[in-house]
Curated annotation (Swiss-Prot):
Keywords: Cell outer membrane, Conjugation, Membrane, Plasmid
Cellular component, GO annotation: cell outer membrane
Pfam assignment, any one: TraL
Protein name: Protein TraL
InterPro entries: Pilus_assmbly_TraL, T4SS_TraL
Protein encoded by which gene: traL
Its job: Membrane protein involved in F pilin formation.
Signal peptide: none
Gene Ontology terms: biological process: pilus assembly
Major localisation: membrane
């Protein structure tokens, strides 16, 4: 059995197959729009409005996803956004 165990040790299995990268505890599809709102609030000196918009955008994306993965949100954008806007992103 030790020979089989040594063969299995060279493979690394993730905890889940859909384990996505997170920054500051948030997946990128939720972090980027919120960071854009906060950045806009900082550049226009409307700090509270930027933070409030970021919170609303964050919860809006969470409600839209409803426990589904980031790929579902990407596919939704692919099917419902105009082709001219997404030509360079989805090729």
């Amino acid at each position: 059995m030790s020979g089989d165990e040594n063969k299995l040790k060279k493979y690394r299995f993730p905890e889940t197959l859909t384990n996505q990268s997170r920054w500051f505890g948030l997946p990128l599809d939720e972090l980027i729009p919120a960071a854009i709102c906060i950045g806009w609030g900082i550049t226009t000196s409307k700090y509270l409005f930027g933070i409030g918009a970021a919170v609303l955008v964050y919860f809006g994306i969470k409600k839209l996803k409803k426990g589904r993965g980031s790929s579902w949100l990407r596919d939704l954008i692919y099917w419902y956004m105009p082709t001219a806007l997404l030509r360079g992103i989805f090729s």
